[in-house]
Curated annotation (Swiss-Prot):
Record-linked Pfam families: Aconitase_C
Role summary: Catalyzes the isomerization between 2-isopropylmalate and 3-isopropylmalate, via the formation of 2-isopropylmaleate.
The organism of origin for this protein: Mycolicibacterium smegmatis (strain ATCC 700084 / mc(2)155) (Mycobacterium smegmatis)
EC number: 4.2.1.33
Family note: Belongs to the LeuD family. LeuD type 2 subfamily.
Protein name, per record: 3-isopropylmalate dehydratase small subunit
Catalysis: reaction(s): (2R,3S)-3-isopropylmalate = (2S)-2-isopropylmalate
NCBIfam families the UniProt entry points to: LEUD_arch
Length: 182
């Protein structure tokens, strides 16, 4: 995937990404509150296909369905120097590509165009020419991401009713299923 990059720092927790007040809102309104505590107005600027780049321990904190809100905003992928393991798994479950790239915050600036290939582990800053390769994710994770997340994958494999497959890709399902949102 290729997109415009937004760079954030280290130790961004889920409370800052999805504040308690947002949990009372519907998905579209809650998504507009992502990062408002650390970068007010960001959701007015982010565009479908953009990529969030962050530092170490991205997504620490409680298990909030932030990945669903990134999906609602149209964020194409998350790339971090290191993910909190629970947050990483929630992103995969929501079908949001997440790639670990050590040193990525030094390789990109806001507005750079980045290309990230989960299948090969290759990444490239199309603006500056920097690039590299990281270990490829396991096939199971790549399959879950390709299927749009864990629930749609289960529906497509017959473990859930097939007619739910498209519905289960919805950000509203992920947020409502967590106890937040509508």
């Amino acid at each position: 995937m290729t997109g415009r990059v937004w760079v954030f720092g280290d130790s961004l927790n889920t409370d800052a990404m999805y504040p308690p007040d947002a949990m009372k809102l519907d998905v579209a309104a809650a998504a507009k509150m992502v990062f408002y505590q650390v970068r007010p107005g960001w959701t007015d600027e982010v565009q479908r296909g953009d990529i969030v780049v962050a530092g170490n321990n991205f997504g620490l904190g409680s298990s909030r369905p932030v990945a669903a809100l990134f999906n609602e905003l149209g964020v194409a992928a998350l790339v971090a120097e290191e993910f909190n393991s629970l947050f990483f798994r929630n992103a995969v479950n929501a079908g949001l590509p997440a790639m670990t790239v050590p040193g990525v915050t030094e390789a990109f600036s806001d507005g750079d165009i980045g290309t990230f290939d989960l299948g090969t582990g290759e990444w490239h800053n199309d603006t500056t020419g920097a690039g590299g390769t990281v270990p490829v994710l396991p096939d199971l994770i790549l399959d879950i991401l390709a299927g749009g997340g864990v629930l749609p994958r289960l529906a497509e494999r017959g473990y859930l009713p097939a007619e739910l497959a498209e519905t289960l890709r919805s950000a509203a399902v992920a947020v409502a299923g967590s106890g937040g949102g509508a």
